[in-house]
Amino acid sequence: MKNKNPFNIFFPLSLDKIENLEKIKKNCSSIQYAWLSGYFWNLANQTPSRLICEKNEFFRKDNEEKIITIISASQTGNARQLAKRFNKYLKNENKKTNLIDAADYNFKKIKNERFLILIISTQGEGEPPEEALSFYKFIMSKKAPRLENLHYSVFGLGDVSYNLFCQAGKDFDKRFSELGGKSLLHRLDSDIEYESNYIQWSEELLLAINKIDVSTCSVFKKNDKKNFIDKLNYTKYKPAVATVLLNQKITGRNSTKDVHHIELDITNSNIVYTPGDALGVWYQNSSQLIKQILKLLSIRISDKVKVKDKIITIFEALKKNFELTTNTKHIIQKYTDVTQNKFLKKIISDNKKLNNYVKKTPLLKMIYDHPKKLSSQQLISILRPLKPRLYSISSSQSEMNDEVHITVGVVKKQISGTIHLGGSSSYLSQFLKIDDSVKIFVEEKSNFRLPENKDVPIIMIGSGTGIAPFRAFIQQRDNDKATGKNWIFFGNPNFTEDFLYQLEWQKYLKKKLLTKMSLAWSRDQKEKIYVQDKIRENGKELWEWVNQGAQIYVCGNASKMAKDVEKELLDVFSKNGSMDIEESSEFLNNLRITRRYQRDVY
């Protein structure tokens, strides 16, 4: 039995053809060899494009046409938007692509990939986004396959003010290399101002792909540097304008929290959203805060400054273009450079002191403690560009039609007797009035979705404003007349002051749409009770729901509540499912892979 020849461009003849050549070879003289050489060379002496096409034909005969897989792993939507842009960019170069979210990617088949592009953000303490957790755990495990045939590139998105800047991208890049993958292009770690980095990276990466991939016969031509942005109705950089219908405080007067329910009219925007999505809001800085900063730096509000090739007043620039409520190590370092302040020089020379100073010192306080006369251009050179903030949508469009609702917790910090407010949360809760306009866009959260099967039970776990998406969920279940059971765990400090949307939840309980509600009030008694305590208390029943196919949803703080909840879920599975901790962890990971465990954490 003859073995098949591994037919490829480096050895492009089948065994039968080689045998025929051997027969000819036996009966030829040296002169005939020379003539045959010239004859075949003449046939081969064609245009490069023709040769490339013929070469490609060889690949098509024995292999499927190579597809470039583009994976987005996004926390706030930036990675997803860049992945969409890069996908369109490649398609315009006649490349075959497969654009997919990390949550939908079948990572166990990664060994079959030839080209893989990963665009990934980092959350928390250097962790991958929620939708990439399963992929991350798999690729870091002993189960990960060798990737000698893989050509890859990683584009990392992050915030340079964090110690573990772009760590998720770094981890994937290192691991792909350890498994034998070949990097098409050096990994790019990009801060929030990523546009110019992306354009250069995308062009260089296309060139790198073209050196290896000849699956198309088109001649490469340099693209317009603008690249292609998907023509969505509304995006982060092309937001819709909504009108405020209602802005109502929903915590009690004695509450330690200030939470507002905000309703926006989207009648004229044709915006479409789904329960689980987030609403992006472009906020404006407080006029009072701007005036305080300018006064301390001896800058007139009418001074002109250049922003994005436009000349505007410094007041207008600070109002809409720069962050004023967030301090970072880079801002402190830049402010130290322009002021040459001795105290700040000592701070930045010690990383531990610098980290502590960042946590305790807002931008305004730093300037107040160390004022210096600056020019308007010097001021904006140290600031970060303003970013929109994302809020979980707390309404179902099926119920609310031309409205979108959000639940906003005001960020407050008291430092040295002064209250410092969050820029976006204070803008939404305190400055927006009825009929005011606000710029918005929808950030799709495809990995935080209700089950398609309306008979499937769901378990919702949230604390504080983490209840917001579950209000949308229950409205949708009501509209769909879903028959699946619904159980919510909710925690906040006090029953009388902090029971968000109390009357609505009681209504759903009364009509038996809400099957069960487990409440945790941390300050209503001496011993603090949190949602994880309620999970432990109801562990046996929760395990029964899981065995009935229930999907689990968690929304809230990533570093505290969500971690404590996950730890308790692992313990519940271990105790009630007769598993050790490793088996329990594997069980939870399988729930995540099958979309039965979904989180929206921040």
Swiss-Prot record:
Cofactor note: Binds 1 FAD per subunit. Binds 1 FMN per subunit.
Binding-site list for NADP(+): 522-523, 528-532, 564
EC number of the protein: 1.8.1.2
Keyword Membrane: no
Gene3D superfamilies, alphabetized: 3.40.50.360, NADPH-cytochrome p450 Reductase, Chain A, domain 3, Nucleotide-binding domain of ferredoxin-NADP reductase (FNR) module, Translation factors
Biological process, per Gene Ontology: cysteine biosynthetic process; hydrogen sulfide biosynthetic process; sulfate assimilation
Cross-referenced InterPro entries: CysJ, CysJ-like_FAD-binding, CysJ_Proteobact, FAD-bd_FR_type, Flavdoxin-like, Flavodoxin/NO_synth, Flavoprot_Pyr_Nucl_cyt_Rdtase, Flavoprotein-like_sf
Pathway per the UniProt entry: Sulfur metabolism; hydrogen sulfide biosynthesis; hydrogen sulfide from sulfite (NADPH route): step 1/1
UniProt binding sites for FAD: 325, 359, 389-392, 407-409, 422-425, 602
Protein role: Component of the sulfite reductase complex that catalyzes the 6-electron reduction of sulfite to sulfide. This is one of several activities required for the biosynthesis of L-cysteine from sulfate. The flavoprotein component catalyzes the electron flow from NADPH -> FAD -> FMN to the hemoprotein component.
Membership in a protein family: Belongs to the NADPH-dependent sulphite reductase flavoprotein subunit CysJ family. In the N-terminal section; belongs to the flavodoxin family.
HAMAP family xrefs: CysJ
The protein, known as: Sulfite reductase [NADPH] flavoprotein alpha-component
Lineage: Bacteria, Pseudomonadati, Pseudomonadota, Gammaproteobacteria, Enterobacterales
Gene it is expressed from: cysJ
